[in-house]
Amino acid sequence: MFKNLARLGLSLCVAISAASHAKAMEMQMMPSHHSPIGIMGDHLAMEDKWMISVRLSRMAMKGNQLNGDSILDQDVLQQSNPYASVPNMPMELSVVPQDMTMDMLMVGAMYAPSDALTLMGMVMFNTKEMSLATYNGMMGRSYLGSFDTSSSDLSQASLTALYKLYKTPKHRAHLHLGFTQGVGKNNVMDKVLTPMNMQAVMTLPYGMQSSDRSRRLTVGITNVSTLGGYRLGNQLLFDTALAKKSWTYGDQWNVNSWVQRDFGHDLSFSARLHYKSQQSINGRDVSIMAPVQTANPDNYGGQVVDFAVGMSVASNMFGGNHEKIGMELVLPVKQNKRGLQMESNWSFILGYEITL
C-alpha cells in the first residue's frame, strides 16, 4: 500500500513538474510568437495582459516616375502645370523633387479584457524632409538652385479592436475593427525657391503635411498557421475615410503575406511580401498651388509591391521573459504609382515589444 502511494506521489510530482516546465516554456516568448515587426495587430494578448511596443522607421525616396516608368528631371520639366492659369505661374512644371525621407515613431499599447478580445491603441509621430531643384519657368529652363522643406508633428492616433475567430494549436485567425484620427497639421508652411528665382513662404504640398486630419475606418482579418518549423501569416486590411476634410488621402488596401522560422529559442528570421493599392487624394486645398508635381492631388496613390526581410530576437533588456527586438529591411519590387510621383527606394523598421 505504501509503495503504491509512493509511486502515485512520485507520478504526481513528475506530472506537476512537467506541467510547470511546459507552462514556463509557453510563457517564454519565442521570437516567432509575434509576426515580423512591420506587421501591426498580428496577434491577440492573453486575458488581462498588457503589451507595449515602440517602432522606429525610416523611408527613403529618390528620383521620379511617370505612370510607373522612371524619368529624368528634364522629362519632368516638360509636364504641364495644372495651375498654369494662375497669374505668374509657368506653363510647365518647374520645381522637381530630388529626394525625400520620412521618419516615424509609433508607440502602441495592447490590453486584453478577455482571451477573445484585445484592444490596441497607437500614436504616431512623423518627420518629413524633402530636397527639390528649381528651374527657370520661362525659356531656357536653366537651373536656378535647390532648397529643402520639412515638417514634423504628431500625425495620428488610433484605437483598434481585435476579435478572435478561432484558435487551434496550429491555426488562429482574428478580425480587425479600428478607428484612426488624424491629429497633425495639414497646413504647414515653409520657405521655397520659386521659378522666378525668389524666395517665398508657401503651404507645403499634401505629401509633406503631417496628416489629412480625417477620421478613418480600418477593417480586416489576420490568420497565422504553423507548418512544420515555419509560421505562415496573411493579413488583409481596408482603410477608408469617414469624416473628410477639405482633402483626404484615398481609400487603400494592404495585403501582407509572410513566412517566419525560429532558430533556437532566441532568434527568428522572416520574409514578407506587401501589396498596397491606394486611390488618389479626395478634394483639394486651394492654398496649395505650385509648379511641382506634389501640389497636384491626382499625383497620389497607385499600386506598389514590396519585399521585406526581417529578424527578431528574444531579449531581456528590462529583465523580463516577454521581450522582443525586431527589425526589417523593405525594398520595392514593383511601383505602379498614379501620375507623376517620387520613386520609393528603401525602408527600415526597428521595434521593441514587451508583454507585462
Predicted region positions:
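Residue-level signature of outer-membrane beta-barrel architecture
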Residues: 45, 56, 111, 123, ...
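Transmembrane beta-barrel strands of outer-membrane/channel proteins
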Residues: 52-58, 121-125, 175-181, 234-238, ...
